[in-house]
A protein has these predicted regions:
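Nucleotide/pyrophosphate-binding catalytic subdomain
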Residues: 1-217
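Generic structural hydrophobic/aromatic packing signal, biased to beta-strands
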Residues: 94, 200, 226-228, 240
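A broadly conserved detector of short glycine/acidic/proline-rich loop/turn motifs that flank catalytic sites
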Residues: 136-137, 175, 230-232, 244
Length: 259
């Protein structure tokens, strides 16, 4: 039995149909005999909507209160996905970041994970349940809610995979893998079958937004192999891993933008 961590971004769970699509992907993975931990982002534009709500009240909100507010987005997502999984007959439990054991420093809105306490996740897995975890959030030494910054759910997924020694860490997005440039903006892009951590960081420095930088750095530190996949199209994605002797140089200068 393999342990698989799957992360789904906001576009993958933005509405009812997308939530059930994700639930089917997760349920099929579990029914294949795997233990599954799912990390979920806030739905669609929820985070931006919450930021706008704060701006309606004040133009200078405290970072602590912003974290309290923004954490609500992921909590909605995990509850809805757990409901969908249970509706499909796949027993699931949703956990907030702090219930899942994320402990962070005190840097509100851009916290860093200091340790993972995996007892609760492990307990749920032993009960043969899918564990649905809110990405992007944790708890600091003051027992205050903290968030990890934009793209923090990727980092949450990698941290869980590292702490649990997962067999796979799959990052589901709305694109089919890692390309040499954004296929939505640039002609003649090429999807990469595999790419090294350093090359992924190089692409990110050039503006690629497939993976959060901190998540790639964490994956490199703990040698967590990542697989970038589309939640909308079941085709092979891109593996992000440490360099091996048989890997060719995969990157070349990005093509010119579309007119």
């Amino acid at each position: 039995m393999a342990l698989i961590v799957q992360k789904f971004g906001g576009s993958s769970v933005k509405d009812r149909n997308r939530i059930f699509n994700v639930a089917r992907i997760v349920a099929n993975t579990h029914k294949a005999g795997n233990d599954v931990v799912v990390v979920v982002s806030a739905q669609g534009d929820t985070t931006d909507d919450l930021i706008a709500k704060a701006a309606e009240i004040t133009h200078n909100p405290s970072a602590r209160e912003m974290d309290m507010l923004l954490a609500a987005g992921e909590e909605i997502s995990i509850a809805l996905l757990a409901m969908a999984l249970n509706e499909l007959g796949c027993h699931a439990t949703s956990l907030t970041g702090w219930q899942a054991g994320f402990r962070t420093d005190r840097a509100y809105t851009k916290a860093r994970i200091t340790r993972m306490e995996t007892e609760r996740i492990s307990s749920e897995l032993e009960r043969n349940r899918v564990v649905v975890v809110a990405g992007f959030q944790g708890l600091n030494k003051l027992d205050d809610i903290t968030t990890l910054g934009r793209g923090g759910s990727d980092t949450s997924a990698v941290a869980i995979a590292a702490a649990l020694h997962a067999d796979r860490c799959q990052i589901y997005t709305d694109v089919e893998g890692v390309y040499t440039a954004d296929p939505r903006k640039v002609r003649n892009t090429r999807k990469l079958e595999e790419i090294t951590f350093d090359e992924m960081l190089e692409l990110a420095s050039l503006g690629a937004q497939v993976l959060n930088n901190r998540s790639v750095e964490l994956a490199k530190k703990y040698n967590v192999e990542l697989e970038v996949l589309s939640s909308l199209n079941p085709v092979p994605g891109t593996v992000v891993k440490e360099v091996t002797k048989d890997m060719d140089c995969l990157l070349y200068t990005s093509p010119s933008p579309r007119d």
